[in-house]
């Protein structure tokens, strides 16, 4: 492999060190996008997933040269909102986003999340019914995948995505067919 190789996509999960679910949420996202290390024979998406948090009053930078496209997922809870270290860091991320170097998705885990930075647009937020990734895990996965697809394909918010879903028409319980029909009619 040459030293010029870049992975197509990398994802960074950012959370405040005082977020009690931050590390656990990072691991779940890692298993979702990269692979589940406790099941080594299962295939995964193999998207590199890294974390960033505010240890020792600093946050390591995101390496935008590692991949062709980079996503930063901000887990915006009350701790991140109240921590001034994140203010500058998010400003730096927004500059990189303006330059096309990365895309920011913020997850609303606090009623104050929209106020963390006025330059973060509401469309950039993944909003969950209960503001809790653990209880809204299925909803979070759908919204995350939707945002990733839109970013990779340069789709705008509101623009319809077209997906091809392969299914078996001969499965005994007809689960594949019924799932395909329900998705088609969604």
Please state what every model-predicted region is.
Residues 108, 116, 128-131:
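Acidic metal-coordinating catalytic centers involved in nucleic-acid phosphodiester chemistry
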Residues 112-125:
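Glycine-rich, charge-decorated loop segments at or immediately adjacent to ligand/cofactor-binding or catalytic sites
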């Amino acid at each position: 492999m040459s030293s010029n190789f870049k992975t197509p996509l990398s994802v960074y999960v950012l959370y405040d060190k005082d977020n009690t679910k931050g590390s656990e949420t990072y691991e779940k996202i890692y298993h979702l996008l990269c692979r589940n290390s406790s099941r080594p024979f299962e295939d995964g998406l193999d998207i590199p997933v890294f974390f960033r948090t505010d240890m020792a009053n600093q946050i390591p930078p995101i390496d935008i040269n590692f991949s062709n496209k980079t996503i930063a997922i901000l887990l915006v809870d009350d701790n991140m909102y109240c921590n001034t270290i994140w203010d500058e860091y998010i400003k730096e991320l927004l500059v990189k986003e303006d330059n096309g170097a990365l895309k920011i998705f913020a997850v609303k885990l606090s009623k104050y999340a929209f106020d963390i930075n006025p330059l973060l647009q509401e469309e950039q937020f993944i909003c969950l019914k209960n503001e809790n990734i653990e209880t809204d895990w299925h909803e979070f996965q759908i919204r995350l995948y939707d945002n990733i697809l839109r970013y990779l394909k340069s789709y705008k918010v509101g623009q319809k995505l077209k997906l091809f879903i392969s299914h078996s028409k001969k499965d005994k319980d007809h689960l594949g067919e019924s799932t395909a029909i329900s998705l088609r009619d969604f």
